[in-house]
């Protein structure tokens, strides 16, 4: 995505235009790095939670703890899978744009990317919040409702879930930063869309 939105006019200086292009390239490189990190963290989070299983024998009865037992963890896995796939596609687009040196001129496409980033960011925040609340209940219990501390029996399961939530949190922070960058990029297009009129003396 291009973040310049500044056309070359008779009043623009070539040096200034070159400087703006360098700034634009740095922003796009930053976006590429962030999207790659989000993809990695989201994928790790989904794998950690989805593969987390622990079996305990209680009074000769085997009890298995898995992520599907908690709807919040299922939601977290699905959301992080979506975030990883979306970030991978956008990272590839950023890389291709950098290699070709092309800029995004289509405002509808810029808005589509903006709304996509916003949606994924909000979903990531919701997923982490729901999973963190469920994890807190599993760790601390709820004496008033006679909810026991599940993590006292399934320590390994809870530890791996905690690692998954931590990885999802990093992915969430990255998506929030990316959504800010895409918002800046969209509104930057409109900020420089009108050519400057030369003043008359």
From Swiss-Prot:
Keyword Transport on this protein? no
Query: Where does this protein reside within or beyond the cell?
Result: Cell membrane
**UniProt keyword Membrane, yes or no:** yes
- Show the Pfam families listed in the entry: CASP_dom
Keyword list (alphabetical) reads: Cell membrane, Membrane, Transmembrane, Transmembrane helix
Show the stretches that span the lipid bilayer. 29-49, 72-92, 109-129, 167-187
Tell me the protein family, please.
Answer: Belongs to the Casparian strip membrane proteins (CASP) family.
Assembly information from the UniProt record: Homodimer and heterodimers.
Q: What is this protein called?
A: CASP-like protein 2B2
Q: Which organism is it from?
A: Arabidopsis lyrata subsp. lyrata
